[in-house]
């Protein structure tokens, strides 16, 4: 769902080529209905372009950078050469995610027995303003463990979360590090075991014995910041116990 009528200079856009001429190519902007774009041959590739059809063809989708916007005519000038492969891949992935989000939004509207435009006005536009993209809103709803958006009221929220959790898979991230624990006490092995025992109320983590005196710890979560916070709490807890039990301890990030 795009709430802007026109892109801005510097934006990356997905363009479907509709016509290729000797000195340029025309295309439609997939994310902006009714908006056309033009790529001059000088903006197709770095260096001299002898045959433009070696780079562009009708029906092809490319990612371009907006270099000029004509508000009155609703058309834009575009550059293909100013977009690198990494930017192109990311933009295409983002566009496909938004297409998926639009379909999920239609499902939400259908379940609510409401018109698509009515849903956009009621909560769609607000979610895009809040999260930047509709897909990001669905990701947030899918990852929610408690009440989602507690400061916002609406009978649509439960349905939105339901559709999100059924259709969006949140990939896990992991943060890891190494503990090195030493003790010369007669019961040193038991002390080290106690030091490296992680209280469940702090968080879940995987502890793996690598080889004396190293232990690898991994924290997984769908939220990177939460994973970092959990690891930080675990390290603090283990460090405090090590001091109390007189176990020498070192921690390093992987």
Curated annotation (Swiss-Prot):
Gene3D superfamilies: EIF_2_alpha, Nucleic acid-binding proteins, Translation initiation factor 2, subunit 1, domain 2
Keywords: Initiation factor, Protein biosynthesis, RNA-binding
Keyword RNA-binding belongs to the record: yes
Pfam families (UniProt xref): EIF_2_alpha (PF07541), S1 (PF00575)
Domain S1 motif residue range list: 10-81
An annotated Gene Ontology molecular function: translation initiation factor activity
Function comment: eIF-2 functions in the early steps of protein synthesis by forming a ternary complex with GTP and initiator tRNA.
Family of the protein in this entry: Belongs to the eIF-2-alpha family.
Quaternary structure and interacting proteins, as annotated: Heterotrimer composed of an alpha, a beta and a gamma chain.
Protein name: Translation initiation factor 2 subunit alpha
Upper lineage: Archaea, Methanobacteriati, Thermoplasmatota, Thermoplasmata, Thermoplasmatales
Name of the encoding gene: eif2a
């Amino acid at each position: 769902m795009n709430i802007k009528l026109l892109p801005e200079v510097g934006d990356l856009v997905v363009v479907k080529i509709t016509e290729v001429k000797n000195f340029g190519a025309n295309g439609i902007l997939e994310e902006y209905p009714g908006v056309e774009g033009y790529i001059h041959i000088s903006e197709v590739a770095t260096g001299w372009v002898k045959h433009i059809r070696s780079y562009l063809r009708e029906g092809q989708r490319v990612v371009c950078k907006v270099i000029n916007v004509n508000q009155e005519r609703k058309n834009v000038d575009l550059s293909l050469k100013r977009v690198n492969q990494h930017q192109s891949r990311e933009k295409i992935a983002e566009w496909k995610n938004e297409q998926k989000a639009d379909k999920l939004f239609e499902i939400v509207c259908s379940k609510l027995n409401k018109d698509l435009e009515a849903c956009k006005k009621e909560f769609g536009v607000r979610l895009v303003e809040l999260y930047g993209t509709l897909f990001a809103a669905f990701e947030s709803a899918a990852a929610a463990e408690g009440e989602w958006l507690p400061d916002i009221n609406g009978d649509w929220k439960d349905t939105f979360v339901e559709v999100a959790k059924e259709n969006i898979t949140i990939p896990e991230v992991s943060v890891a590090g190494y503990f090195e624990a030493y003790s010369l006490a007669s019961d040193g092995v038991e002390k080290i075991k106690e030091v490296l025992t992680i209280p469940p109320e702090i968080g879940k983590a995987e502890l793996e014995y690598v080889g004396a005196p190293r232990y690898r710890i991994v924290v997984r979560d769908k939220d990177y910041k939460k994973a970092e916070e959990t690891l930080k709490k675990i390290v603090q807890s283990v460090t405090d116990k090590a001091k109390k039990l007189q176990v020498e301890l070192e921690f390093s990030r992987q």
